[in-house]
């Protein structure tokens, strides 16, 4: 049997888990099924991920990296916050929502699974804290690169943007309609742009400065 590096084996298992969870659902998927999907013995999976919770955490982090890549794809950060909102969120929707419905269902199942199985809902908190931090950092970087300020805190903007997109995803999952979803997403982005009200930051002269 060919030797596989630990990092590669972990990626292999996580990719198999995402596929299995997306197709079969989080609650009903066993570690044995994930091992079978990855083409490895169950003992190997247990060695890499001793518990299902550890595997789910790795899955969440992998999905976050994928979302980050989708947000940043072909994005020109110095074009400002409005561009980041419209282009970044639009790119995410096209790449990870309309063509990956199973992935979106999996993410909601991860949250509800955690809330049902963990007394403190730690996995659900991790999931949304990381999502919110990712979106917040994305917006803040875009504004700073373009020399803009935002009318509200970037953390607030990130949470509200996440809430709006989550709601639209749930509607799309329940009743897929590409045209309606795209219209609603554009309306939501219009509202977010108005709420953020990005403006260029201009250097102002000191009050005691005199004109020559």
How should each PLM-predicted stretch be described?
Residues 119-125, 142-212:
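Hydrophobic/aromatic-rich alpha-helical bundle segments in the mid-to-C-terminal region
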Residues 9-12, 16-54, 58:
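Helix-turn-helix
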Residues 61-67:
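Short, basic, alpha-helical segments at the C-terminal edge of helix-turn-helix-like DNA-binding modules
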Residues 42, 107-111:
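Conserved short hydrophobic patches within well-ordered secondary structure
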Residues 98, 102-105, 118-144, 156:
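Amphipathic alpha-helical packing segments from all-alpha helical-bundle domains
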Residues 20, 66, 134, 138:
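Short alpha-helical functional segments enriched in proximate histidine and acidic residues
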Residues 58, 72-104, 154-161:
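Hydrophobic alpha-helical connector segments
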């Amino acid at each position: 049997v060919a030797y596989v590096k630990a990092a590669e084996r972990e990626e292999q298992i996580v990719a198999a888990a995402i596929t299995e969870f997306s197709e079969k659902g989080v609650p009903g998927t066993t570690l044995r099924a994930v091992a079978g999907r990855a083409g490895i013995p169950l003992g190997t999976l247990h060695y890499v991920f001793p518990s299902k919770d550890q595997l789910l955490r790795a899955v969440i982090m992998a999905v976050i990296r994928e979302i980050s890549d989708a947000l940043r794809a072909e994005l020109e950060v110095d074009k400002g916050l409005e561009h980041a909102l419209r282009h970044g969120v639009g790119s995410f929707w096209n790449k990870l929502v309309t063509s990956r419905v199973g992935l979106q269902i999996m993410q909601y199942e991860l949250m509800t699974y955690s809330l049902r199985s963990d007394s403190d809902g730690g996995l659900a908190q991790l999931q949304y804290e990381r999502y919110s931090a990712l979106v917040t950092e994305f917006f803040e970087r875009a504004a700073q690169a373009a020399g803009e300020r935002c009318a509200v805190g970037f953390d607030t903007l990130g949470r509200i943007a996440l809430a709006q997109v989550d709601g639209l995803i749930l509607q799309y999952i329940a009743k897929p309609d590409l045209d309606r979803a795209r219209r609603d997403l554009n309306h939501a982005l219009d509202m977010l742009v108005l709420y953020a009200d990005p403006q260029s930051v201009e250097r102002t002269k000191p009050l005691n400065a005199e004109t020559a």
